[in-house]
Amino acid sequence: MKRVLTALAAALPFAAHAADAISGAVEHQPTNWQAIIMFLIFVVFTLGITYWASKRVRSRSDYYTAGGNITGFQNGLAIAGDYMSAASFLGISALVFTSGYDGLIYSLGFLVGWPIILFLIAERLRNLGRYTFADVASYRLKQGPIRILSACGSLVVVALYLIAQMVGAGKLIELLFGLNYHIAVVLVGVLMMMYVLFGGMLATTWVQIIKAVLLLFGASFMAFMVMKHVGFSFNNLFTEAMAVHPKGTAIMSPGGLVQDPISALSLGLGLMFGTAGLPHILMRFFTVSDAREARKSVFYATGFMGYFYILTFIIGFGAIMLVGANPAYKDAAGALIGGNNMAAVHLANAVGGNLFLGFISAVAFATILAVVAGLTLAGASAVSHDLYANVFRKGATEREELKVSKITVLVLGVIAIILGVLFENQNIAFMVGLAFAIAASCNFPIILLSMYWSKLTTRGAMLGGWLGLLTAVVLMILGPTIWVQILGHEKAIFPYEYPALFSISVAFLGIWFFSATDNSAEGNREREQFRAQFIRSQTGFGVQQGRAH
């Protein structure tokens, strides 16, 4: 059955990743009952898991980190589920559909950050921290200021990510399911709160695992059917795609996506270092028992995500052949029905019929829930653990801390729903770019230098971290996306779309300069404590494991 999907503006490249940020107006669609039934099955099953998890959440450790008893394989699958989004699936395949080989290059940008996490961060992070990355950043530095900075960096990233997720969720669900936008946003918000409020990290982990399995299965089936169509020959795949694509052989050439070298470098640095500074990703490394399992988590996650991005490349070229060359998927003007971001959805219909289209639509919805649940838990832990229990109310009991965390979940959920409704017709794609830039410019430098640079002091971390955060925000506002496209000015003050190259440089230089010039007695004590921190980060001596974690 042909589904009529209305025109949808293509999201900015950053939105192709984890924001599910589908921008532009959409109209109410016919109800997709197959998708709704499949999604209801997923919801009932995951709510059952949440009920099961709620019976096992008895302590702060259980709530924040699932007691540290998630295996490396399970955590790797959950990390992949947390990182691979609906728009990663739709957006990257759409990028391949329109730009060919450049889409593969762009997708690699989201993978290059993982070797950094594997070799530089995962092991030491697990050995030094308990619940949040602020535990690591403040290990030998002054607790109050560093936790405030880390929590602010986390909350800004979470807020920007969450708004983009909620708006994108409403648009995507309205498009795929035929549900009203406001109903879709409220539904996502309520389910998100239920998962995190009652099941904590254990429920969130299993929602992410199930979503990852479903997404990998769906993408694998689509790629298999595409390869079957071309006799399992990549040569045939590329030859047929070039024959029908308007750009012809140019789709096999790189360099057309970001032609300015500074923008390309800035985009790459933002993707690479931003990944290593995302709070909801870093939090996952505390769910395993030790550093060895943390390393295994990254290994498995990288494997799953690498496989997924290879699948999106095949799906994108399959869409060129089976969707782009099929008039049934074009509107009267010759454009793809629903916009280029719907290329993978149309391909699902082409290779598996309406039933498989319903399955892919349900998986897209499940994907959104998995991502927002992880974001909400990261935001709640930043407020309850970093700010409440370690800054404003030192010595608070576990019960008090958990109460604050659950109140924060409710507040974040309500705010996310309200902002999701208010931003319905706004261009929110820039929020994902800003979230990555802040994660790369504030969170990542502090985490990295706190673990590796013996001369880091509280003064340097504070001033450099705030400089990086503010630089990223200011340059993003003055850049082409916000200053010209949103605010309507004729010319951008800052000429580049991605600020990461400059804001990361400012952060590292600021941290180095203000630490190097810090001759205070407190700064000298912090330098002396690095050796003890280094030994623990390398050996894990003193780290609590398992349920005692």
UniProtKB/Swiss-Prot annotation:
**Per its UniProt record, what Gene3D superfamilies does this chain match?**
Sodium/glucose cotransporter
Keyword list (alphabetical) reads:
Cell inner membrane, Cell membrane, Ion transport, Membrane, Sodium, Sodium transport, Symport, Transmembrane, Transmembrane helix, Transport
Give GO cellular component annotations, separated by semicolons.
plasma membrane
Superkingdom, according to UniProt?
Bacteria
The record's GO molecular-function terms, alphabetically, read: acetate transmembrane transporter activity; glycolate transmembrane transporter activity; symporter activity
The record describes its membrane topology as: Multi-pass membrane protein
Q: Which InterPro entries match?
A: Cation/Ac_symporter_ActP (IPR014083), Na/Glc_symporter_sf (IPR038377), Na/solute_symporter (IPR001734), Na/solute_symporter_CS (IPR018212), Sodium:Solute_Symporter (IPR050277)
**Cell location:** Cell inner membrane
Q: List membrane-spanning regions.
A: 33-53, 77-97, 103-123, 148-168, 183-203, 206-226, 262-282, 303-323, 355-375, 404-424, 428-448, 464-484, 493-513
Pfam families recorded? SSF
Provide the GO biological process annotations: plasma membrane acetate transport; sodium ion transport
Instruction: Report the protein's function.
Output: Transports acetate.
Q: Give the UniProt family note.
A: Belongs to the sodium:solute symporter (SSF) (TC 2.A.21) family.
Q: Which HAMAP family does this chain map to?
A: Acet_symport_ActP (MF_01426)
The protein here is known as Cation/acetate symporter ActP
What is the source species? Answer: Salmonella choleraesuis (strain SC-B67)
Lineage, uppermost ranks: Bacteria, Pseudomonadati, Pseudomonadota, Gammaproteobacteria, Enterobacterales
